[in-house]
Amino acid sequence: WDGNRWRTEDTLAATDLIRSVCRHAAVRAENPKVAAKLASSSTVGGVERLARADRRHAATTEEWDADPWLLNTPGGVVDLKTGRQRPHDRADRMTKITTATPGGDCQTWRRFLDEVTGGDVELHAYLQRMVGYALTGSTQEHALFFLYGTGANGKSVFVNTLATILGDYATNAPMDTF
């Protein structure tokens, strides 16, 4: 847990922590044989195996990023149903995060949308709903969105900007998926 999300631990930080605890216990041990045993690699490995087997430390894959209506941002967690933002909570078990926090005027983005839609306010609103719907992962509407048009009209800029903002939530699917 880094304060905003859970990260995959592949740097052996847990092993380092266990080793440190065992060494600290060895220094405090009065019996030299006990101290040597506590500092041994077999003790460190045994403690690590016990910790891995402890159900209090376990989580199933279904528990991570389980609520499709919560969006994790650097500034907090946004409930996509209400639009409300609240502080991060480790109990949400979120592993993904966007690169931006909602708010601000985004004048450059608005100008871009005006340019590529010809100022069509209804199309702006549609694009906003489309992106919001895509954020949830919900299939309630049975919709699949395609951006269609001639070249150099903003499709790639639109998609790439959203992918950058959405951070860990954005994925690319190869065309042969469809």
Which sequence ranges carry the predicted segments?
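P-loop NTPase catalytic core of nucleic-acid-dependent motor ATPases
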Residues: 1-12, 63-65, 70, 77-178
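General helical structural elements
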Residues: 23, 53, 94-97
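Extended, Lys/Arg-enriched charged tracts that mediate electrostatic binding to polyanionic substrates
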Residues: 33-77, 81
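Residue-level signal for secondary-structure boundary elements
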Residues: 26-35, 46-47, 55-59, 121-125, ...
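Short, small/acidic-rich helices and loops at N termini and domain boundaries
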Residues: 1-48
